[in-house]
């Protein structure tokens, strides 16, 4: 709890919205402004050799300010933890949107791709190379503008942008040929290749170079040969050819990409890559409000803000600025005022009772991408699903940011160990400049925050308990043995253990040999992790604030791209159908109401994939759907697995 003392002075923590290999992302409320943020929480001991990667990401984000880059607000470091407070991106991963549409039209692709080019061109102008460009590292904000996240693998060459890098990193399916060969390379040229892969994925819905065998995939990338679908236009084919040149010297440069004919079609002007959010001029209204609040004169406050320490003052100023940009009053609240539905009381009670958050059972509430309506508080003792209520925070049509959400990212799938060896990084201050375009998606297909229910552990593949039948039962939670060498942060209990685990990532990291370098847990805590304990305490102490019952059946959600509609009208029938299919696909799961928390494991017990499937009632008469959400694991493996599961269901 001591590590959280400073953080809890300024933020109220809500549910977990993303998980990754070494981080967890929580939704939180900034107390003074009432603005929602995403807080990336990392344990230094768990990070091990990944610690330099986090330092790299922090330094990069302190120097980058752009309308298409996820904004860093605040950095807190304690003896054991690092907290990064980041912009809250409710729109979810670009990857999820692509697979929901199968592929994007050329016009839609152009809108999206211009934003990607804008962000990457700005990154390059500041002397950085991102080196991990992929759809999972691009999130949508509440206005459906793209935000680039995850700068843990970025590099800032020591000399200039023409300095050749040596480190082999990134995801194989998006990595440039010169990078995977181990040659020295220019970061900007490698990024252009990755952007070419992105462009192909946007217009085609699948990877240009793909194979289950890593060596076969390596050879395909080195040959540079890929299928050209018949629906691609001649101009888009030409651009792909120019970006996916195996020889980096023949590859199109970023300068020429900005005003490429395909890029400019329907726009008639080049991509505006300059920053529209420079730090050069402070906003008068925000400075005045902070001066009044802190009882300082304007000049003193301007001087303090201009230090850009990324402390609470920086966070408050930037969040006030964000409020103003959305047309909200530039006003700070009393520090004693509680945000949203969750109060600071739980944390006070913890201290007064000498509880340790390590000793509280986790609520396991993971934020679901694409949430429009969601319930902030849930009842863990309920066996049904709560009917969500509309929240004032309708921002996130998903993610995390990535967590690692991605997302912050929602959700955050990262490649460990060797990706971090960024010897090329050096610190230099950033300059400012300006850019951008807006994009409204068609009516999405949607999920909602998942509610908490008592775990119903399945002990045989054929005995399932639907929430409606379980209402009058006393459920006995059966402990499940977990492999000793399993390394997941959240150990998933399961009763249906498959003899065969076959999920392997296509996008294996280039330094896969080092994947086990991250220190293993010395032993699972009896009642769950510290962060998960926060969820539980908030749940227990705010239960009275619930609206509606958790026993009313599946939640009613708005249509969203993360929801698959079915022909069935009975939610219990659909739930049983899914549960009968999962063991056949070698997927272990835990049932909580109408939500199934699923995972796959390797032959050695290592968790390779975590995702959720929730049966929901759409806001139309007699329409039942399945909400899908990836929590951890390779995005393309997840896509294939979930498609296989859903196609096998008789729905």
UniProtKB/Swiss-Prot annotation:
- The record's active-site residues are 132
Q: In which tissues is it expressed?
A: Expressed in placenta, kidney, thymus, testis, ovary and intestine.
Q: Which UniProt keywords apply?
A: Apoptosis, ATP-binding, Calcium, Cell cycle, Cell membrane, Kinase, Lipid-binding, Membrane, Nucleotide-binding, Phosphoprotein, Serine/threonine-protein kinase, Transferase
Q: GO MF terms on file?
A: ATP binding; calcium ion binding; lipid binding; non-membrane spanning protein tyrosine kinase activity; protein serine kinase activity; protein serine/threonine kinase activity
Signal peptide (UniProt feature, chain positions): none
The record describes its quaternary structure and partners as: Monomer. Interacts with ZNF622 and PPP1R8.
Additional facts recorded: Potential therapeutic target for treatment of somatic tumors, such as brain and breast cancers, down-regulation of MELK inhibiting tumorigenesis.
Q: What is the protein name given in its UniProt record? A: Maternal embryonic leucine zipper kinase
* UniProt organism field: Homo sapiens (Human)
The lineage, from the top, is: Eukaryota, Metazoa, Chordata, Craniata, Vertebrata
